[in-house]
UniProtKB/Swiss-Prot annotation, chain A:
Annotated GTP binding sites: 24-31
Location of this chain's protein in the cell: Cytoplasm
Subunit structure: Homodimer. UreD, UreF and UreG form a complex that acts as a GTP-hydrolysis-dependent molecular chaperone, activating the urease apoprotein by helping to assemble the nickel containing metallocenter of UreC. The UreE protein probably delivers the nickel.
Source organism (scientific name): Bradyrhizobium sp. (strain BTAi1 / ATCC BAA-1182)
InterPro entries: CobW/HypB/UreG_nucleotide-bd (IPR003495), P-loop_NTPase (IPR027417), UreG (IPR004400)
GO BP term, pick one: urea catabolic process
Highest taxon of the lineage: Bacteria
Protein's UniProt name: Urease accessory protein UreG 1
GO CC, one annotated term: cytoplasm
Main location: cytoplasm
Record flagged with keyword Nucleotide-binding: yes
GO molecular function terms noted in the UniProt entry: GTP binding; GTPase activity; nickel cation binding
Keywords from the named record: Chaperone, Cytoplasm, GTP-binding, Nickel insertion, Nucleotide-binding
Amino acid sequence: MLHALRQAKAQATATVAARVGIGGPVGSGKTALIEALIPVLQRRGVDFAVVTNDLVTKEDAERLRRSGLIDPDRVSAVEAGACPHTVIREDPTLNIAAGDELEARFPGVELILFESGGDNLASTFSLDLVDWWIFVIDVAGGDDIPRKRGPGLLRCDLLVVNKIDLAPHVGVDLDRMLADARQVRGGKPVIATNLKAGTGVEAVADAISAAVLFRI
Amino acid sequence: MLPLLRAIWQADAAFPSGAFAFSYGIEGALALRPDMSLGEFERLCAAVLQQRWASYDRIALQRAFRAGRDLDALAAVDREIEASTMIEALRAGSRRNGASFLAAHARLGQPLALKLRAQVKAGDCLGHIAVMQGAIWAALQLDEQHAALCSAYTVASGLITAAVRLGAVGALQGQSVLQALLPLIDALVATPLDDDAELESFIPILDIAAARHVHAELRLFAN
Ligand SMILES: Nc1nc2c(ncn2[C@@H]2O[C@H](COP(=O)(O)OP(=O)(O)O)[C@@H](O)[C@H]2O)c(=O)[nH]1
Ligand SMILES: [Mg+2]
């Protein structure tokens, strides 16, 4: 009896994919992070799919589909009705439905990444939609960004500070920016990345695996 | 008062149902006529209510409302919508909005929503928004007339919100249009509906705009 129950529970959980959000300002590197994560997740044998929330048509979805990195059918696009905030927070139902639809089409899927259309530092993901979420900022936005304490930056489960290669070119003191970020986040994780070179991508994949896939 | 309160709950734009992402063809129409005046915009909204909502969505909504929990009857109305909506963008938009609406009610644990979601998943039902609203609102014990008001009101307020977000009308200009549309909604809902009324919808500018919208390079709304 107990065994049957456990089995039923295992089956029920096996059909439900972990849902991870990737938010942050436009141009910070959200799509680049997904592009960098794809081969790492594939190498680790993770069965995953992606939902993009483009502000304008299906730009990001098409970019991922054409990348040749992932089966194009595993990328779904949700148009955000000019409201990138709303579609991940006040009304996440389009995204929830897109995730359900991917789960139905790919029964083994364990992880679904949701890329936000991107807007300002105030954007956060509804916990109805995702189990865990990443916020991506970049150094070119300025080293005072952490001190502005936007809800996105404070509340996310993982903060990614991207484009560290650009720090010397934009006059940003990277160590100080990272220290400020860790301080305002009360010690919650911060990872520095250079997605052009792949720096930090394994660490982001480790964080996702540990948080929602329960693999270390 | 409870049935009325339930209708207000469902008509509230704060209820997450995906509706905000659909422009009912307005985005395409504004692209065709970027200099549309407020008066023309109001007439276009009235045309949507009269020529699409009243003769199409409302009929599907009422049939679904009366079908209640009869899944076969609901699937039949659903297939009729699919067959009689000529424009692919509107057909796909209606299905996606229906899926979001169902996702919301399924998450809230509504038993019929869970069943319908399984049907859509299995391909036994397509899940058009008007049919899902009719079925779920009956299950939530809204009054039939309130359900019709709720449906027409959400279409009207959706048109206006879309136009405001596209920058075509101001937030208060939009509300003046919505206020002017209320008597029309009232009159449309008060008109009795024949049991054998056929689904009909034809608004040339919106149909053409929606058809062109599919190919638009730059668009914010799903339809
Ligand atoms: N130098 C540098 N450029 C990057 C890095 N990551 C992303 N970019 C570039 O930044 C731009 C925006 O990236 P994208 O992923 O589209 O941003 P999104 O809007 O957040 O999805 C693109 O031109 C990327 O090539 C990085 O680590 N270093
Ligand atoms: Mg992007």
